[in-house]
Each structure stands twice: as structure tokens, then as C-alpha cells.
């Protein structure tokens, strides 16, 4: 099993305070955390780094979180991507599932739930690990 410090999480949110809080939560748990304030920054990070667990805000300036998830899925179907939003509707949840989100969390999200989601995601990736393709 890979240690938490070897596991990277990408957090995308346009609110600086939310980015700082999520970075602190995941970093304290031992994860390496990359942050982006919009979809374009996130896509740049993903061009140069392999990150298999992501938490995306849905309401981003420019490209929204759902469209960002579609873009991520065009290139790689394996990453586990979570939606984090302040607004939730049945239609929005259906859109998220269609785009490839693993789950949808409505703000404010309890810290324990976010940490459990990250832990579960990395455990799942560990089970999926295939020869010559290091998922985490």
C-alpha cells in the first residue's frame, strides 16, 4: 500500500478561502495537494502531473466544474473525481453523474466526509492497480 504522502489530490475552487481550507485538511492528513482557482489552471497542472483524486467546485469562472470533468474524462477515465458545490438539484446531480463524477458533496462538507472520500478513492485505485500502470 502506498503511503498517504505519496498520494496527490487536486482541489479546484475559485474561492481562495475554500482552497486554503481544503489544502490544509488534506495536507494535515498527509496528502500532497495541488490547487487551482479555475478549470484552465487545473488542466495545465494535469498536463504535467498525474493526479488520480480530484475535488472540483461546480461553479467556476469560465469553464464550469461539470465541463472540466468532461475534459478530464476525455483524456483519462481512471481518476476519481468528486464534485463540491454550494448548490444541489436533482438535475445537477444527474449532470454530475453523466460527466463522470464519483459523488457530489454539498457545502459545507464535514471534514470527516472529505477525508473518508479521499481514503476510499485511494483504496479503490490500489485495488485497480494493474501491471505497468501506476495509478497512484
Label the model's feature ranges.
Residues 19, 61, 89:
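The feature encodes the CheY-like receiver
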Residues 44, 66-77:
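Short amphipathic alpha-helix used as the core "switch/output" element in two-component signaling
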Residues 50-55, 60:
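Active-site beta3 strand of CheY-like receiver
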Residues 20-28:
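Charged docking surfaces used in two-component/phosphorelay signaling
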Residues 109-118:
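C-terminal output helix
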Residues 37-38, 64-67:
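Acidic catalytic/metal-coordinating carboxylates
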Residues 67, 88-103, 116:
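Alpha4 helix (beta4-alpha4-beta5 surface) of REC/receiver domains from two-component response regulators
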Amino acid at each position: 500500500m502506498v503511503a498517504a504522502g505519496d498520494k496527490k489530490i487536486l482541489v479546484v475552487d475559485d474561492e481562495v478561502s475554500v482552497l486554503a481550507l481544503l489544502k490544509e485538511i488534506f495536507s494535515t492528513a498527509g496528502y500532497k495537494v495541488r490547487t487551482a482557482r479555475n478549470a484552465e489552471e487545473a488542466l495545465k497542472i494535469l498536463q504535467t502531473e498525474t493526479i488520480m483524486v480530484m475535488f472540483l467546485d461546480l461553479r467556476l469562472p469560465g469553464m464550469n466544474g461539470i465541463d472540466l470533468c468532461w475534459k478530464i474524462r476525455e483524456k483519462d477515465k481512471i481518476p476519481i473525481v468528486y464534485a463540491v458545490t454550494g448548490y444541489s438539484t436533482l438535475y445537477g446531480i444527474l449532470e454530475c453523474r453523466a460527466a463522470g463524477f464519483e459523488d457530489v458533496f454539498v457545502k459545507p462538507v464535514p471534514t470527516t466526509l472529505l477525508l473518508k472520500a479521499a481514503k476510499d478513492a485511494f483504496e479503490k485505485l490500489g485495488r485497480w492497480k494493474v501491471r505497468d500502470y501506476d495509478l497512484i
